[in-house]
């Protein structure tokens, strides 16, 4: 065991110094450079550092432990065992107390069972109490979830002897969760515990220097002891992750018995990521050919199929709900439904102790920190990871993948679907994978622009959410923004996940195009090509995934009919809505209707169904209602509202009152024909939301778009959109989008030649004609249009298409009257004799039609329910 103190500064080996911001940022984020950073920080003088190697992590005896003990060690290193040993020794008398803070209810229950099993008695959980306020009498040894800290009485909060924070980085991430209520109070109480408890123990596999430095500020560096262990159990030490370059979805698609109608699209596709080609011309239910099946050899599904037929037990992780159903369907077809356990947000929980009863376990991020499967039951693991704006971040993916502690074959097959990582010019990769190569391995033409993007991101983060000054939230907001905003980049997401896997001593290799090719280490020069292959493959598999999804939905519908699970009729649904007070209130606020039976037309019913299936739709309803209210104002009225909101304190402006009017009461959705209330989470960044929506109102007013009156056949001049967006970007649109949407837009002024080269190299944007995927239209558009497309899609669910019409308007030019033909010629400044006939004017217009193509136009496809909005605003308070 090596023990050293922070007073000495070791010689640098050049490794950390050689890292540029873009190369080092992932390692810094997850504490891979923790020892070097602490030992070279003068402010950490007096801190003690204990490096352990070759054995499970151990803690010093309680009598020799400094007030703050920080333990950084990989998954499977024995952190929980060391904690129990420490607590057993410390809690040697009944008068000593402890509070253990967790990030999830499942983690609390799991830790409670582990304590009981190992003889650590006397602990209660916040779930055991009938009283809301937890008092000293029964809860001096308490396991509590972070959000429930507010239930602890003040007298009890100040008297705990030891605070334990297992999975401390997950606790930190919880401060940014949309489920976090009373953020400032919880932040204050947690910080108070960190300051006042006699002992603090913080543990995690990814403890970073930011956390240790924060604890040193709160308690003094001389009171901090850091234990860093590189030990991992055999289950991780010998594990190898093979990144597949093909999914092979044609294999499960060949097993389905239902065919989707032509043009049916996966619900998972984001509105901001339209299909790469028009699927409406595809034949209904395209046949799966022998060539399609042959092409799956060596793919994700091929490897899974082989192992199932060989009788192996397999666990499968999926980062999306939709794919978890697809892979569970496939495994059930190969084996039997009874052999497969599916765990996702729509299925009941099953204790990990029961997993060994199944040949296949498929799970999503519902299985995360605090839940582990330790038995040597599974031979192989498969993982499907899809980075997307609304999906789990790579830390959540890594945590979920690590729940299975032992694999008999020590092999993990991973496929990354990068079809939703919609990069340049809207988004730019900025992380260079340190596990592939150091700064010197990356060419300067990639390294320099990547560093530039990192520095701009840091500047944008530093100015975001300035009204949140609490210690924990403000200190870790950049980490949170980085983990969320990088989900738009295949390169950045893979680089973060690669760093996390390497942190746990898992070797990562990639498989090439040839099925018989061995997995090889990833090289810098091959990385861009590999990302490009992944994108090509992801798009080519879309039609197969749509086919399987449709089949699963049809089979589920047939099953419900067989077991007589009858949903209400349309008339019964409307009657239930008309009798529901929350539904009537919702109808009045958003649509200006009483909520009577006749008010529930098809667009509103469809909206409520969508809110039941896709929670994001509820936020879009609020956003669109606020935009409609802003667009309904006169020019003078909006000028006053906008100016006042810009200079008012947070929450006090008229515009803030509009937001509160729509957010204060629950919305109502329909789940299987029955009304359910939907609470809109008030997450950190609400100030960013109001600022972003104000900017959108200004853009909408400038281009003439209004939700209730917009004609989908109307064309919008791209030049008008570009001017409006340029003004919004200059006013801070990028910062507002980062605060609320967690998106890091690349501003048009940043798009220099080197930045575009970076996008081409790491953007995974190449397409393959063999799969019917032509060049992306988005690449031909200006960056302002690309940002506009993403904003309107994500905020309002509006699809934006490039108009294919040669001439303005929806009427065929041949059918126009002479005065209309003359108006079109005047518009492009083409002279004509006043005595010209209709035929002559038409011919002259056709000769000059190329002049119209120089002015591209857009079509906005607005959801039908938007036309029902009332644009209501809260009534002004009457003066006494």
Curated annotation (Swiss-Prot):
Residues 260-287 are annotated as: Disordered. One of its GO terms (biological process) is DNA replication. It comes from the Viruses. InterPro entries: Helicase_ATP-bd, P-loop_NTPase, Replication_origin-bd. ATP binds at residues 73-80. Functions as a docking protein to recruit essential components of the viral replication machinery to viral DNA origins. In the presence of the major DNA-binding protein, opens dsDNA leading to a conformational change in the origin that facilitates DNA unwinding and subsequent replication. This is Replication origin-binding protein. The gene is UL9.
